[in-house]
Amino acid sequence: MKKIRSHSIPLREKDFQRSVIEYAKMMGWRVYHTPPALTRSGRWITPVQGDVGFPDLILCRPPRLIIVELKRIGGKISPAQREWLSALQACTGVECYIWYPSDWEQILSVLSR
């Protein structure tokens, strides 16, 4: 799993995510993201079936497939997220990343290749 970090940029995760998605689309990537939903009890869930911890973004621009977990500054990867990323990284040809807002320059580089 490639983890890239540089200087800090103060962004909320949803703003960061929107920026990554916009840039990816601008560079010709197909983007998949399932947004979380707020339940009546005030809990956030992702309304899909599957094991918990699935990464935030799937980016496809043949021949490349990128799987991304996005984190806010100071955000931590959960054990379930780490398990998913490890399993996906073991698949041939899949690139997996954990990106923080401070990684912006490297994100631009990865998505522009």
Predicted features along the sequence, with ranges:
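Catalytic phosphate/metal-binding cores of nucleic-acid and nucleotide-processing enzymes, i.e., regions
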Residues: 1-113
